[in-house]
Amino acid sequence: MGQKINPIGFRLGINRTWDSRWFADNAEYGQLLHEDLKIRAYLMEELKSAGIAKVVIERPHKKCRVTIHSARPGLIIGKKGADIEKLRKKLSEMTNSETHLNIVEVRKPEVDATLVAQSIAQQLERRVAFRRAMKRAVQSAMRLGAEGIKITCAGRLGGAEIARTEWYREGRVPLHTLRADIDYGTAEAETAFGICGVKVWIFKGEILEHDPMASERRATESDNQGGSGRERRRENA
């Protein structure tokens, strides 16, 4: 079962927590869920060049707090914070409530599964050979501390007449082990021959304590140790 299920959903409540963190009664739940989906779709499309790894949405009393984890936060913030203010106003209109916007820098994009998948998809769109793109991503992830990585590419690879799936793995990726800290990300490459799908699994080690926030806390600590200078974070109210 661990081979087929989404590794993040499989570990929710064990060593992963939800990206939408709020509570609502039955009357409001559907509306807020659709709001979250619209916010994420808008941000992923609008900030495509900023390398969005994750969007966390929290809803304290009659407010909305959106935290964007990005590999290139400067593109979101803009000159003197002009772009982030426009973005905050747009999100306030979408949620119809006061919205706070936080930007958190991802210091090691090479070991973030979503960013790795996006990078490979962009290379496929630029007609880079899929094997070269996969191998380069694997080498970068292992060099920066990943204990294992697996990448699959599916579609008309290299312009082939028949679609197929190719995969590459290095190190351990124990999908059945619930205490394993496994990051998972997907992306689509819109090539001249059709859409190619990219999936990435990255094994970052084992988390022995039973704590839903453990994976997120561990990633933050790793970023702070690996990066130079202070953590780059911008809050806009």
UniProtKB/Swiss-Prot annotation:
Domain (KH type-2) ranges: 39-107
Stored Gene3D superfamilies: 3.30.300.20, Ribosomal protein S3, C-terminal domain (3.30.1140.32)
Keywords of this entry: Ribonucleoprotein, Ribosomal protein, RNA-binding, rRNA-binding
GO cellular component: cytosolic small ribosomal subunit
SMART domains named among the record's database cross-references: KH (SM00322)
A biological process term (GO) from this entry: translation
Summary of the function given for this chain in its UniProt record: Binds the lower part of the 30S subunit head. Binds mRNA in the 70S ribosome, positioning it for translation.
Protein name: Small ribosomal subunit protein uS3
Gene name in the database record: rpsC
